[in-house]
């Protein structure tokens, strides 16, 4: 009787371990899938943000700070309730970025724009979250900072 009980316990443990191992394998595969999607999303956002930064502030005379501010405004818009929820939707939102319709967005970004886009995607916006406008004139509720000929303004 004791032998049977021990044998049943051993079998239950084996089945339990097999089930646990199967669940772990499934969880690992799911995690790999999530990581792959995050990698794809990062690459897509890097492409979009580096092209936007280059098109809006990629001239040699533009400072690195201005490039960071341009990218930060786009990232802040993703977080703000008045704008779309993805970087792609923010950039392609009708009437927001002239570089979309004038063709400048499609130009290959310079190395500085790519480097700064990576910095921003990995470290986040360098501006307060309510700074969601950039233009050569003041918009929204006021100017947070002016960099060169660009005003960075709050909602």
PLM ranges: what are they?
Residues 1-2, 36:
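Intrinsically disordered, low-complexity sequence elements enriched in Ser/Thr/Gly/Pro
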Residues 2-21:
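Sec-dependent N-terminal signal peptides of Gram-positive bacterial secreted proteins and lipoproteins
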Residues 25-155:
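Bacterial extracytoplasmic/cell-wall-associated proteins, especially those involved in peptidoglycan
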């Amino acid at each position: 009787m004791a032998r049977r009980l021990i044998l049943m316990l051993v079998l239950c443990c084996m089945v339990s371990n097999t089930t646990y191992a199967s669940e772990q394998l499934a969880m690992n595969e799911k995690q790999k899938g999530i990581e792959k999607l995050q990698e794809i999303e990062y690459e897509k956002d890097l492409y979009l943000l580096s092209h936007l930064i280059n098109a809006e502030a990629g001239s040699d005379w533009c400072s690195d700070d201005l490039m960071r501010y341009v990218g930060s405004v786009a990232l802040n818009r993703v977080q703000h309730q008045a704008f779309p929820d993805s970087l792609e939707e923010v950039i392609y939102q009708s009437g927001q970025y002239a570089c979309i319709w004038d063709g400048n967005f499609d130009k290959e970004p310079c190395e500085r724009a790519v480097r700064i886009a990576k910095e921003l995607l990995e470290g986040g916006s360098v501006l307060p979250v309510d700074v969601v406008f950039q233009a050569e004139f003041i918009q929204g509720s006021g100017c947070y900072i002016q960099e060169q000929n660009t005003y960075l303004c709050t909602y």
